């Protein structure tokens, strides 16, 4: 997995994973008003509006697959750093600190069109979207669908919740995982 990140950022590209893939059931939350008007609640849109990002960019981000910035790669002289910093200044000016760096990179990719190499989910597996399976023969976590690729990085973004307790904060929280067997 780490090797893929090194390869992905060749020639100034951003190496990163989108939060979309097989088995993901929801792309975005939507609240329906009077049964006909959709109030978009996607992470990108919500953060963009709170940060004062103009409507045209906010709307473009609304249904773009969210890019989680928890794991990424960039060469030190990549142009993407400058674009990201420009966007980060905008998002921090009016928005909250939490989520600003992610919003800035989503704007860089979907609005500024920086060069990007999208990596597979196994490079940044977000458990709150979909739990992995466990391969007890290989003693490793794998994607829950065929061909059950080995997961390289597991990310507890948004936590794992059970009985209103977050596994990141409460080590007594236990979850059940399906196995390959």
Task: Identify what each model region corresponds to.
Residues 1-181:
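Glycosyltransferase catalytic domains, chiefly GT-A lineage
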């Amino acid at each position: 997995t780490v090797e893929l990140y090194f390869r992905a950022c060749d020639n100034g590209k951003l190496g990163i994973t989108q939060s979309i893939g097989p088995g993901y059931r929801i792309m975005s939350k939507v609240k329906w008003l009077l049964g006909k008007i959709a109030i978009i609640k996607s992470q990108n849109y919500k953060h963009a509006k709170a940060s004062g990002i103009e409507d045209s960019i906010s709307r473009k981000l609304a249904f773009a697959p969210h890019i989680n910035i928890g794991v990424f790669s960039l060469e030190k002289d990549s142009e993407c750093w400058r674009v990201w910093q420009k966007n980060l200044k905008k998002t921090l000016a009016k928005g909250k600190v939490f989520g600003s760096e992610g919003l800035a990179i989503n704007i860089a990719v979907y609005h500024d069109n920086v060069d990007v190499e999208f990596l597979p989910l196994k490079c940044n597996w977000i458990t709150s979207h979909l739990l992995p399976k466990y391969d007890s023969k290989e003693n490793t976590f794998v994607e829950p669908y065929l061909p059950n690729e080995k997961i390289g990085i597991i990310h507890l973004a948004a936590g794992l919740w059970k009985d209103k307790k977050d596994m990141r904060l409460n080590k007594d929280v236990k979850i059940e995982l399906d196995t390959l067997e």
